[in-house]
């Protein structure tokens, strides 16, 4: 399936800025990838001394393969980039559009455990306006990858700047990292906040403060 024009534009913008997730080309179909992942996951689980003949575990390698390709890492494939509705700002609306508490679940690329949090996204309309649900879908697309939160925040910013044809975009993310919570230091209360500010959100203290306020 050919990539949409929006997907091509966003991918190009990220590559030009060095913000694309590190990836190498893969010529395999999604079904072929699932078969290979299932095979290797079966070997990994066997090395962990799990009995894959047990009825609770027998389908686990297949479930994990499907989850990786079709769900939690589906954002690695730009064929899954959301269909974007951008409309001309004919009404001349020029006040901040802000979407709070966008739920996001991603995966830490260092340990492949969960990142769980919320995003706040805002923009000042110029030439274009985007359908509100598309903002949520863009956040989700980039979250469905192995990620670091700093890159994820920047990817959402650049994607919206590209599609809206304006620098005036801001993104803030607050998340719990299970690589901190469930292993290592095992800190169950800390959260991580990242921001990516563009245009007037970066240059104007009042606009920045309005965005960062509840």
Curated annotation (Swiss-Prot):
Toroid-shaped homodecamer, composed of two pentamers of five dimers. It comes from Shewanella loihica (strain ATCC BAA-1088 / PV-4). This is GTP cyclohydrolase 1. It catalyses: GTP + H2O = 7,8-dihydroneopterin 3'-triphosphate + formate + H(+). One of its GO terms (biological process) is tetrahydrofolate biosynthetic process. It comes from the Bacteria. The keyword Cell cycle does not apply. Belongs to the GTP cyclohydrolase I family. Keywords: GTP-binding, Hydrolase, Metal-binding, Nucleotide-binding, One-carbon metabolism, Zinc. PROSITE patterns: GTP_CYCLOHYDROL_1_1, GTP_CYCLOHYDROL_1_2. The keyword Methyltransferase does not apply. GO terms for molecular function: GTP binding; GTP cyclohydrolase I activity; zinc ion binding. Its EC number is 3.5.4.16. GO terms for cellular component: cytoplasm. Pathway: Cofactor biosynthesis; 7,8-dihydroneopterin triphosphate biosynthesis; 7,8-dihydroneopterin triphosphate from GTP: step 1/1. Zn(2+) binds at residues 108, 111, 179.
């Amino acid at each position: 399936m050919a990539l949409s024009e929006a997907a091509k534009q966003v991918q190009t913008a990220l590559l030009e800025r060095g913000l694309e997730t590190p990836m190498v080309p893969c010529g395999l179909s999604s079904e072929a990838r699932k078969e290979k992942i299932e095979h290797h996951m079966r070997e990994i689980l066997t090395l962990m001394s799990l009995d894959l003949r047990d009825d609770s575990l027998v389908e686990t390698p297949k479930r994990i393969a499907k989850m990786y390709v079709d769900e939690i890492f589906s954002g690695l494939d730009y064929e899954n980039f959301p269909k974007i509705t951008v409309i001309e700002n004919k009404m001349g609306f020029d006040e901040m559009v802000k979407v709070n508490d966008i739920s996001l679940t991603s995966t830490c690329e260092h340990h492949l455990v969960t990142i769980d949090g919320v995003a706040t996204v805002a923009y000042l309309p110029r030439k274009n306006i985007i359908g509100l649900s598309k903002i949520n879908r863009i956040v989700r697309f980039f979250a469905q990858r192995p990620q670091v939160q700093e890159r994820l925040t920047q990817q959402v910013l650049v994607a919206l700047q590209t599609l809206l044809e304006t620098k005036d975009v801001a993104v803030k993310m607050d998340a719990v990292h299970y690589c901190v919570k469930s292993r290592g230091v095992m800190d169950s209360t800390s959260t991580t906040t990242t921001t990516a500010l563009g245009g007037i959100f970066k240059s104007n203290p009042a606009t920045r403060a309005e965005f960062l306020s509840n």
